[in-house]
């Protein structure tokens, strides 16, 4: 008789994420580089290791675990994964949400800039930087439907 595989506990998921994050920090040599380069390397790592997948019935697609461990996520998974790295390096960041989308704001070089890993991801393991560290004005020039957020929560954000 086969046994049904059990889902990992929350503690096990956290441990797996922590182990992977430590490996990524080492692999990408993140400790002795400037914040802009860190952000770019983390952005690219997540995009190279995550597939956008809203069709699975797995709740983990909404979390960093889905993005970093399982390799499948929706916008909240991308944003959560990115935030973990930003928090480790004490780079100020905020998760921003509209009615049905989520992305990040990062404070770098004296400015709050938007970064949307989900929208920088594309099929066939390719990605671009259209939503990489952009101002609010640039964000709104690219999209106003999914990125319409309540700006009053982010008064200082550009």
Name each model-derived stretch:
Residues 133-158:
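Leloir-type glycosyltransferase catalytic cores
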């Amino acid at each position: 008789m086969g046994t049904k595989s059990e889902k990992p506990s929350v503690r096990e998921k956290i441990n797996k994420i922590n182990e992977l994050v430590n490996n990524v920090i080492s692999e990408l040599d993140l400790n002795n580089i400037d914040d802009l380069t860190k952000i770019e390397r983390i952005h690219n790592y997540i995009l190279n290791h995550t597939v956008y997948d809203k069709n699975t019935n797995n709740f983990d697609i909404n979390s960093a675990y889905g993005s970093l461990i399982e390799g499948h996520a929706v916008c909240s998974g991308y944003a959560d994964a990115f935030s973990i790295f930003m928090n480790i390096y004490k780079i100020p960041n905020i998760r921003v949400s509209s009615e049905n989308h989520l992305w990040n704001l990062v404070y770098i070089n004296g400015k709050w800039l938007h970064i949307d890993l989900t929208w920088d991801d594309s099929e066939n393991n390719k990605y671009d930087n259209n939503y990489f560290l952009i101002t609010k004005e640039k964000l709104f020039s690219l999209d106003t439907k999914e990125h319409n957020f309540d700006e009053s929560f982010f008064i200082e954000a550009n």
